[in-house]
Structure formats: structure tokens, C-alpha cells
Amino acid sequence: MSLFKSSAVKGVCNKGKKPVIDVDEPSPKSKRTHFSTGVYDPDLFRSYAAFQTYTSQFRDTPLLVERAVDQHSLLDTNIPIWFATKDWNFLLSNLEDAYENLVKEFYANAIVEGEQIKCWVRGKRFSVTPVYLANILQINRPILPIPPVYDELTPDEEVLREALGANLEFSSNGKSISVASLSPELRLLTMIMFSNLYPLSSTGYMNLGQALFLHDLITDIDIDVCSYIFHIVAKTIDWTASRNCIPFCRLISRILKLKGVYPSEDERPYPRPSPITIHTLHASMSHTKKNPKQESHAT
């Protein structure tokens, strides 16, 4: 349950030696040294094909790490209203530290089979499903016959304008909208969305499916966010989307920790981005005034 709805749900503490709650079998921390040498290592990849996938698609792709949202500082904005009925607190809070090699190995080794991702990371086998994501994120999924795939939807312009503002600007081809044409608080919500809910590194424009996700969020339409996270992760694994970043890194790291997969002693956490606060809103407003809008492709 979100802080905006009542009190905060505290995430699992990363400090101290607490027992793992979701381990298939006991697994101590690895003591081996791990370097990205470019040489196939059967301890790190389930097959040579997985190693080739890692080398060609993931090794040089940067991580897009989720940003914690300082919910207390935003209580005087509209953000609390938009999240009031959503129990997405874990998605907005500090999850586990992300470890670059582990995250990339997760994606390179994973295989998507329908509504299941079969995973293999450093010898551990496990599966990820929308139901599993809901369990570890403590989210009550809405009952939807078929959760919409937002990437495949093309909503009517007027539907978007009614919720997102009459001044909403569309790109010349009509396939995306300008984030700068949104109100300051909607731009802040978009920043939260692009970081934690619908990962996107290029934030100047968003496609119509992403705009509909934003529309549904502020109009309190049910969103099966676990199904959509699964969809994004699966697309990244299959590389069916044109992506220049690797999403949900801290969520993946949380899954790995729960499954008893740990970084080696020489691995260090990926730098955490700054949290999203009321100061982020003020900085965004100032930046928009100083910089003209530039159109970019939204994928």
C-alpha cells in the first residue's frame, strides 16, 4: 500500500545478514573473481549462445536504474492523488542495489516461454511470472480479462487531450507527444513513470502507448503493472524493442537476492541515481524555461 494511501510499506533492509526468504536452496556468497573479459565462461552463461547474446546485445548497453521517490516531499503536489489507489510502494522506494554484471547476465541467460521467464544466473535456475512479481512487490493485481499491451495501442488524440491538457503537443507524424507540453506536475509524474514504471531513457517525447499509460494512471483506470513489467522485461530479453538501455535493474537485483544469487567480492553496486523529490520538480520547471524543446524518437 502506498504512503500516499496510508502509511509506507518498508522495503526489505539491505543491511545486516538477514535470512533470504525466497531461496530454492542455501547458497553462500560467491568468492570467485568476476571480470568481463570477453571470454565464454560456463559458470556465467548457460550456453555459448547466451554468451553471444550477452556480447552482442547487453555487454555495452547502459543500465537504466530505478530512482527512489521521496514521497514525503511530494505530499503537497498532485502526485499523491494519482497514486492514492495504487499499492506500488515497492516500485517507488529503494529496492536492492543493482549489480551491472548480474543484471546483464540475467537478461542474456533468460528464455521467454509464454507467461514465464526461465532464468539461469550463476548456476541458479528459477522462473519469473507476473504472479511472482506481484508477490515480491506486494501488489494486488486488478482482474482484467486481457491486460492491454500499451506499446500496441494508438489512442485518439482527443482522449489524451482531455486528461493530459488541451495544450498537448503531438509530433509531426502524430505518433508521439511532447513531454514539455505537459504541466509541471505531469512532467514529474512522467519522470517517475520513465524511471520506475515504464522505463525510457529518452524523455523528450513519448509514444502514444506511453501517453495512454500516463492517461490511465491519472484517471485511475486499473493497470496491471506486474503484467506490464513482465512484458517489458520479456521484450528486453528477446530484444524485440529498439532499446538503448537495460530496464528494471534494481528489481532484477531484488529477484536475484531472493533467489540466493549474490555478487562476487570484487563486484560493486551500480551508482544509485538521485531520488525524485520536490526539488526535482522545481529543477525541471527551471530547465524547461531555459531550454527549447527538441523532438526525439520515442520507442
Give residue ranges: language-model regions:
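A structural signal for long, well-ordered, hydrophobic/aromatic- and basic-residue-enriched core segments
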Residues: 2-296
